[in-house]
Amino acid sequence: MRHLLISALLMAVAVTAAANTLAASAERTRSDRASATQTVRISDLQAGKRFDGIGAVNGGGATSVLLKDYPEPQRSQIMDLVYKPKFGASVSAILVEVPGDGNSTQGSMPSHSHYRGDANFLRGYIWWVMREAQQRNPLLALDATAWSAPAWVGNFWSQDMADYYLAWLQGLREVHGLELDALGCHNEKGWSGDFAKMLRKAMNERGFANVKLHGFGNWGQSKMDFVRAMQEDKELADALDAVCAHTYSEIPLSAEQRAAIEAMGKPIWNSEDHVYLKGFDCLISIVKCFNENYIISGATRIINWYDIAGVYPLEPYSCDPAMVLAREPWSGHYSVRESLWGYAHYGQFSTVGWQYVDQGCLKLDGGGSIITLRNPATDDFSIIIETMEANSVQNLEVRLPKGLSRQPLCVWRSNAQQQFVRQPDVNQKSGRIRLTLEPNTVYSLSTTTGQQHGTFADIPAPAPFPIPYSDDFEHYEQPAAWGYLPHYLADLIGAFEIVEAPKHPGLCLRQTVGDHTLSWAPEWHHYTIIGDSAWTDYEVSADVYLNPQDEAAVMGRLCDVGSGYGIWAKGYYLKLDDQGTCKLVITRGKLNQKELIGDKEQQEAILARKDVEIGGEYTLSEAKVSGISPLQWHNLRLRFDGDQITGYVDGIEVVKATSDHYSKGMAGLMAPLQEHRISTPYFDNLKINPVGRTKAVTAQRLTVEPLYRTN
């Protein structure tokens, strides 16, 4: 037995040594390839697809809800950094969410049509985002699709849904003077050939024949299953102007899928890719994503989720995907992430309508990739290179045909130390460009001019959320000018809108969604959040007006709002119903914290949280309050002082509990979810005051410009 063990050990050592030798040999081979000069020969300028743009999503939740509340000039600066040509990211396409009242990762946005017959094209802020973006770049491609829809629509593949889209397009055109470039059938909810045909027919009949229709925006291995149906159904193939799906960087198209789509003459779009990294790793991965989307999958429009993080840090994905963090409108502070310059390496060197040059689009022998784009109207061209997977310096020679400019090329470089910095120009010699490429670096070369590393010197310093804080909603004199949305409140689900107050003159807030939406994500109570995650001891209060069968609540110590696919909160709330039942409740998030739901990234986020807490909602204290009936105003106040939590109704203590389960967190307002309906209470005179350990933070209230002109 001992001899057998020794023989086995010697054999294992020999196998390991052989494997190490093979690995070293492979590494030397790769290094040898890198030290040699790789030549990229371009002779055919006609072989290559139309470039349809790179860009980002604004949506998939209320991703920029705090951006609207920024003072000037900071609000305009942030938009410049993302959308102004040859300044910052300079994206060439934007895909926005058609708001539908439901949660779609980072909260919800109010629909233009809460109920059948409702039509309000100033509700929400997404119209403002589109207008501001296209004002900066008239060539910007405007794309859109829905994540959620109001209950009255019935189902996503109905004539009502087609009509819902058409009304939104009409409002975009008639009220805001904007024309959409393309519309998606839906986001991540399967596919329906009949719906695509129905929607295309309706768009053609109602004056939107020029708006391209793409489908179907799904993820996973089955995301292209509908392509076979397109091959067998000419009407369906004719209905779709482009074929799209998500996350080609994770699951690229197969050669067969790509060939089938190209045989039908359809462009391939990626309507949502994901790069969830930090720092320079995010920047170079974005460029790699853009390059490989075309090289491998043939995608000519690549949209990443998402652009501007105008959300509270408490919310999921509040930092890593975004280009700009804009989460302190009360101070005016914002910060630019390295990822923005990944977009700039494309955005400042190309425009929608350029053409890919296929012979200049490939993986590099020494690691990395190269994309070549040209302007078919001129002789200008650009080359974008990333060397993320390279282990050493590599030499590259690009040989160009006649028909491309012979002017010197500007060179802009990004690495881990410096992002988007201009380098010495590169001269062509008889149509040859010779380059020495450093590993883990991004390069953009172009015969175009005018690129710049845009920046602003007057960014205010960061500051905590002010406390005491109050809002009586009277200063929003024309609610439509503000999109009916108050400052600093971020709706997680539902729509908390500025409306005329019942029973007394003036304005107040109301949760306006009364039915279960066709929500992209699982529903919970409708609620909105405000404040600072560091708050410990404080009081939050609001006047509430209850319709028959309504409930309303104030919330506090909110320290978690879910992983994105589902927004179950962790914290406390004080709830009152129209018959006087008052409850102090602890909410511990999703009932089964380990349940894996949502897409791949959502499931990874759930696993990363390692949350073993028992979820659900539990009543800590309950009382019956006399004198409460529907259609009256009453005051709710929730007080935190150490582990003592007290609830008041109309200034009288009615419930009390001891709990140290959650010690700090944000405040909020809630319209509870009931079995067959959602409450639609009114709220007024929101107040948050420090108690005990929480110290006052004073701040000057900044002037904010309205979103819309209403006269």
For each of these PLM feature ranges, what is it?
Residues D32-D181, C185, G193-K201:
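N-terminal catalytic cores of secreted or lumenal carbohydrate-active enzymes
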Residues D160-A182, N187-Y276:
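Active-site neighborhood of glycoside hydrolase catalytic domains
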Residues Q632-T646:
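Localized edge beta-strand/strand-to-loop motifs within extracellular or lumenal beta-rich domains
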Residues Q359-S405:
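Carbohydrate-binding surface patches
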Residues G589-N635:
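Short, aromatic/His-centered strand-loop micro-motif at the edge of beta-sheets
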Residues K656-I688:
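Flexible glycan-contacting loops in extracellular carbohydrate-active proteins
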Residues A495, K503-G506, Q511-N592:
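Secretory/extracellular carbohydrate-interaction modules
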Residues N270-G368:
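Aromatic/acidic polysaccharide-binding cleft in carbohydrate-active enzymes
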